[in-house]
Amino acid sequence: MDIDPYSVLGVEKDASDELIRRAYRKKALQHHPDRIHDEEKKVEARIEFDKVAIAYGVLSDKKRRKHYDKTGQLRETDADIDFDWKEWLDELYQGVVSGETLNEFKASYQYSEEEKCDVLKAYEKGKGSMDVILEEVMCCEISDEDRFRQVINNAIKDGKISKYKRFAPNEKKRKRRAKAAEREAQEAEELSMELGLDENLKKRRKAGASDEEALSALIRSRQKSRMYNLISNLESKYSKSSTKPKKSKKSRSKE
């Protein structure tokens, strides 16, 4: 998978480690397949999520980042072939959806200028469709609709954006969204029982874990098969590279 990690995360080449971590968290949550309801878009989200995971893997490691800056190659050296991508990606996928990460990001993101900008971008993208806005903006729920409408109405009043007909309140659509959200919550609960996670989730809640933290266990399990597909592709690509004759230290010193 040939990508530009800086472009994928949306950061400049001189971005600090902290900025890269923040960009990674935002992109990972934004493209997480389990926050997408449309099945076709879910496939696209998985592809983007994989790119984000790889980009962060390069830029979060000083040696890989330095090597990429010099050569434009994602793989560091021949020795990097032995890197345990499976273990690293497993930890990465789990870290993205941990309750702590979600709560931390949500606390800093909601009501921020960054969220307001994302709301307005989603408004423009959907031509005023609240369905699109709630689908695009991270960490939001049905209950955020009135708050988002206030943000958008203020921007319209200030002349920053134009008003679309689709933005007009529609009680019928609001009820439909509420029913859809209730149905998805029920499906998630049924899936947790099917996967044998329901008892684990109950124990987490009894132990004082938040709903988001408990649900993260379910999300991680659903991501397992996706993760291993990515790992297989990476290992296949790297194993082909490893068949090439390795240069001796002497020959490398001449280059």
Swiss-Prot record:
Query: What CDD domains does this protein map onto?
Result: DnaJ
Name any one Pfam family assigned in the record.
HTH_DNAJC9
Here the segments flagged for biased composition (Basic residues) are 167-178, 243-255
- Every copy of the J domain together lies at 4-72
Q: Which GO terms describe its molecular function?
A: heat shock protein binding; Hsp70 protein binding
For the region Disordered, what residue ranges are annotated? Answer: 167-215, 230-255
From the Swiss-Prot or TrEMBL record, state where the protein is found.
Answer: Nucleus, Nucleolus
The record's similarity note reads:
Belongs to the DnaJ family.
Output this protein's name: Uncharacterized J domain-containing protein SPAC1071.09c
Kindly state which keywords UniProt assigns to this record, in alphabetical order.
Answer: Chaperone, Nucleus
Looking at the UniProt record for this protein, which Gene Ontology cellular component terms does it annotate, in alphabetical order?
cytoplasm; nucleolus; nucleus
- Chief subcellular location: nucleus
Keyword Chaperone carried by entry: yes
